Amino acid sequence: MLLVLAAALIGRHIEKTDHTLHVGWPPLWSNWNPHVGPGTPAAVAVALAVVAYGPVLAARLPWRALLGAAWATAMAWTWSLALVDGWHRGVAVRLTTRYEYLQVIDRFHDIPATLRDFTHHILLGSPDPWPAHVAGHPPAAPLTFVLLDRIGLGGGGWAGAWCITVGSTACVAVLVTVRRLAGEELARRAAPFLALAPAAVWMGTSADAYFAAVAAWSLAVLALAVTAPTGTRTRCIAFGSGLLFGLTCYLSYGLTLIVVIGAGVLFLGRNRVRALPFLAAGAAVVPAVFTLAGFNWWEAYHLLVERYYDGAGGIRPYSYWVWANLACTVLITGLATAAGLGRVGGALGRGRHDLLPRRTPQGPAAPSPGPTAHHPNPATESRGPAAETRLALLVLCGLLALLVADLSGMSKAETERIWLPFAMWLLPACALLTRPRAWLGAQAVLALLLNHLLLTGW
């Protein structure tokens, strides 16, 4: 919390003297506005229920029932926090402001023509420039809301419901990944923390929640592919992971860094070599479709960098945000995650040898595997040094992706929503903690205070 306090005090001083941060309540894009709303009773009830019963239910429920319960809880938590600000302010208008995607729905009446012309409207000096968030993302992001509008789900209410509903599945995707790579016990221990994450304050309502879910599912499907027996079904799963990764890159330029976490998943999987060709083939599909339609991803990205530095990105001081962004991360992941990250290094140190491939005898002296040979499946391993080390490596990859994004200088402020896709992969570190109820209580109190004391911009 010292980092958060320093970011708040130093940030207020910089904003008061230089006016260069362009945020109302540093380090968050928010304003001080203590309030309650219709979602307050539900938010308190969900928090109390998860703190009281979450760890026990996570340990006892059948696995599939646990996944359903985690999704339902994450949705209830996110919806209730969003409704603290009321339906109109908390959900319906969040994606309709002058910066957002719903402002450009009518400009996509001819989708192929709009894609061909997309890069001509990114720069601020171009004719009819895109709003900030449209210019800042590849066209799959606005196209999502265009397609929702085309099927009769137009307007801010439906867009908000889409982001919350889909975004809440990110916790399920992370649980699936942790179970396949580090074992079911650790996944069960992580479940209440994923469902009750302070990040829900910004997942409802932000399009980045939707992006986080797509990215998380691309990694979850990859984890399934690299831990399943080789076969046609596994190859199809790897191809599906590639499809989702390709879509992720066309929802957000910065989410190409998900490849860092993907590399960790591949390293921990036993069938990574056989999955790679099908993963690559799937990953090429979405880029090929958009490229053939006339959209140039690389050109658009370079134009975005130019626009970023022509706007607030060129004014906000890197010297402040390069560390204040990490304070934002503490707020969206909570004190429990910070404590869990403190145990990640120890877990890696204790079990680092378990991550290295074991050498087996070769030649005539090699023992025969026999008809009952069994390859260990991490999903069935109990908690222990090896499982904790595998979890620690996965979390470390998430942290590394976040740090690369931070050092890039393309994420100065607003990272409480922009980094949601990375923050989800830090939360499993909470599985390494003892006294889960106390830490869950700390997570809930932090989220409730943030949502009731501040009026967040997302």
Predicted regions and their residues:
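Membrane-interface alpha helices of multi-pass inner-membrane proteins
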Residues: 195-202, 235-253, 259-264, 282-283
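Hydrophobic, aromatic-rich transmembrane alpha-helices
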Residues: 49-55, 330-367, 374-388, 401-405, ...
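Membrane-lumen/periplasm interface segments of specific transmembrane helices
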Residues: 3-19, 247-250, 259-260, 264-343
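Start-transfer (signal-anchor) and selected internal transmembrane alpha helices
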Residues: 1-3, 23, 29-97
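Specific aromatic-rich, kink-prone transmembrane helix
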Residues: 173, 211-230, 429
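Perimembrane helix-loop-helix junctions
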Residues: 219-230, 235-239, 256-281, 381-383
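Transmembrane-helix motifs of polytopic, lipid-linked glycan transferases
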Residues: 49-55, 158-181
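Short acidic/glycine- and proline-prone juxtamembrane loop motifs at membrane-interface regions
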Residues: 199, 203-211
